[in-house]
């Protein structure tokens, strides 16, 4: 199953979606294993939406299909507490329009996710890089609170059994 259909069918609001692209301006400078992340907002007026922060546009909301344009690989993670995930998804909307960057009043994709989940009561550890606390994909994927429910490079569907309960 492709990631878009998987998310539309199984992923709860607030799931975090990691993707790697064929072409990225920042991928060579990015020490993160997964190069980009967004928060699955859910549906609004029958449109599946993702909140992300990009180099050119800052924090924005995009259709799920657009989020995946040009992707190479994808992974989807969730928490056991769906209510916390909903709070994080709702928080992501309050950050729309913040410019991209690493300063105090700026937001890059991994910080977006960390800040949304911090507001929902989930603190994420950071890495100290060049004197700054930076969030990377590893800060989420290495945290055992996060459950991987989809990996486009390993399409075993034990994950679906977990989601069905």
From Swiss-Prot:
Chief location bin: virion
Induction of synthesis: Expressed in the late phase of the viral replicative cycle.
Subcellular location: Virion; Host cytoplasm
Keyword annotations of the record: Host cytoplasm, Late protein, Virion
Protease listed as a keyword: no
Cross-referenced Pfam families: Peptidase_C92
Entry GO terms, CC: host cell cytoplasm; virion component
Family annotation (SUPFAM superfamilies): Cysteine proteinases
Superkingdom, taxonomy of origin: Viruses
Family the UniProt entry places it in: Belongs to the orthopoxvirus OPG091 family.
Function in brief: Contributes to vaccinia virus virulence in mice but not to replication in cell culture.
Miscellaneous comment: Displays sequence similarity with a group of bacterial permuted NlpC/P60 proteins. Thus, the ancestor of the OPG091 gene might have been acquired from a bacterial source at the onset of poxvirus evolution.
Protein name per its UniProtKB record: Protein OPG091
Species of provenance: Vaccinia virus (strain Western Reserve)
Gene: OPG091
């Amino acid at each position: 199953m492709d990631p878009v259909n998987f998310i539309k069918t199984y992923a709860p609001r607030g799931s975090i979606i990691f993707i790697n692209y064929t072409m990225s301006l920042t991928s060579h400078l990015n020490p993160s294993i997964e190069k980009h992340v967004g928060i699955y907002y859910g549906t609004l007026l029958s449109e599946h939406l993702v909140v992300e922060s990009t180099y050119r546009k800052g924090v924005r909301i995009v259709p799920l299909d657009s989020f995946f344009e040009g992707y190479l690989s994808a992974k989807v993670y969730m928490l056991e507490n769906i209510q916390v995930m909903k709070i994080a998804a709702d928080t992501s909307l309050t950050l729309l329009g913040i410019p991209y960057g690493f300063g105090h009043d700026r937001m890059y994709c991994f910080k977006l996710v960390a800040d949304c989940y911090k507001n929902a009561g989930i603190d994420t550890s950071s890495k100290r890089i060049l004197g700054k606390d930076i969030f990377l994909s590893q800060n989420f994927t290495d945290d055992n609170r996060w459950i991987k429910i989809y990996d486009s490079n390993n399409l075993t569907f034990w994950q679906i059994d977990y989601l069905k309960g």
